UniProtKB/Swiss-Prot annotation:
Residues 209-297 form the Ig-like C1-type domain. Heterodimer of an alpha chain and a beta chain (beta-2-microglobulin). The modification Phosphoserine is found at residues 356, 359. PROSITE patterns: IG_LIKE, IG_MHC. Involved in the presentation of foreign antigens to the immune system. Residues 207-298 are annotated as: Alpha-3. This is H-2 class I histocompatibility antigen, D-D alpha chain. The gene is H2-D1.
Length: 365
């Protein structure tokens, strides 16, 4: 990563650990683009990563020995050579545009050319189970903060600061929202449907969670009960703790669903309970891979000595998954701004079936 700051690495890791959230039964196509300047270490590093339903399927990395769009899932390998050549050309063109924008951002924010800066973009669409558009995304960021984003109406922009207001006005004059909306409502949805069809054995499968409860004594004398759900797909899952049939929403700690690094996901929910009262509490797990919801409780047949082993089982996949994804993704964390200038952000959306499945704005300023 060269000169990337530790803070940026932590933010990227946090983003990598957290899959995007979609409505149960829906599907998503997302692209995450990152350009990181690194003075003294050559040109900025540029990466693109594509996800279908939180599963990485394509990647481009300018630091690769032979930078090209690469398949990251077996089902995408069936695309022909023209697909990979087209996507590689587009990615290399966008790489140059993002590098120009990084330099422009320095002028907008009166920053020194000696530091490392990050420009990121995320776009994609969510569709219902019947293929209808649920929501579109088109967001830019710079150096750790939001910059500008297309609103849910896909017609207007939200600008985060004064510099972004300049961009908003230019994009409004150029009709950028209309062109972005056309992509999100058209090509994005069409390509997502195609990917779901081609990768149905992987993307439309259901892996039920393996669930168990662990027991952790606290210095205060009470106990933490933690309910684990492992190895499930898709990512949508519900974990709740109950006491006498009532959900303990306020008392419960719930982590974000996290990738395990093997194509499945993990999650846990915990609650602090009085020592000796553990069996009064039940964990409830709901997932589309289960024929019916699971109900679990801590039992005397499951001794506290097993806690360490169970914790290690989940910790190792989470860490490995984070490393794999961080190395693969440079994942999206909403950043501060996106720059346009003299040409007002010209967009290249190729029409027809041979068009790219992903269209980025021409970032020239």
């Amino acid at each position: 990563m060269g000169a990337m700051a530790p803070r940026t690495l932590l933010l990227l890791l946090a983003a990598a650990l957290g899959p995007t959230q979609t409505r149960a039964g829906s599907h998503s196509l997302r692209y995450f683009v990152t350009a990181v300047s690194r003075p003294g270490f050559g040109e900025p590093r540029y990466m693109e990563v594509g996800y279908v339903d939180n599963t990485e399927f394509v990647r481009f990395d300018s630091d690769a020995e032979n930078p090209r769009y690469e398949p990251r899932a077996r089902w995408i390998e069936q695309e022909g050579p023209e697909y990979w050549e087209r996507e590689t050309r587009r990615a290399k063109g966008n790489e140059q545009s993002f590098r120009v924008d990084l330099r422009t951002a320095l002028r907008y924010y009166n920053q020194s050319a000696g530091g490392s800066h990050t420009l990121q973009w995320m776009a994609g669409c969510d569709v219902e189970s019947d293929g209808r558009l649920l929501r579109g995304y088109w967001q830019f960021a710079y150096d750790g903060c939001d910059y500008i984003a297309l609103n849910e109406d896909l017609k207007t922009w939200t600008a985060a600061d004064m510099a972004a207001q300049i961009t908003r006005r230019k994009w409004e004059q150029a009709g950028a929202a209309e062109r972005d909306r056309a992509y999100l409502e058209g090509e994005c949805v069409e390509w997502l449907r195609r990917y779901l069809k081609n990768g149905n054995a992987t993307l439309l499968r259901t892996d039920p969670p393996k669930a168990h409860v662990t027991h952790h004594r606290r210095p205060e004398g009470d106990v933490t009960l933690r309910c684990w759900a492992l190895g499930f797909y898709p990512a949508d899952i519900t974990l709740t703790w109950q006491l006498n049939g009532e959900e303990l929403t306020q008392e419960m700690e719930l982590v974000e669903t996290r990738p395990a690094g093997d194509g499945t996901f993990q999650k846990w929910a915990s609650v602090v309970v009085p020592l000796g009262k553990e069996q009064k509490y039940t964990c409830h797990v709901e997932h589309e891979g289960l024929p019916e919801p699971l109900t679990l409780r801590w039992g005397k047949e499951e001794p506290p000595s097993s806690t360490k082993t169970n914790t290690v089982i989940i910790a190792v996949p989470v860490v490995l998954g984070a490393v794999v994804i961080l190395g693969a993704v440079m994942a999206f964390v909403m950043k501060r701004r996106r720059n346009t200038g003299g040409k007002g952000g010209d967009y290249a959306l190729a029409p027809g079936s041979q068009s790219s499945d992903m269209s980025l704005p021409d970032c020239k300023v």
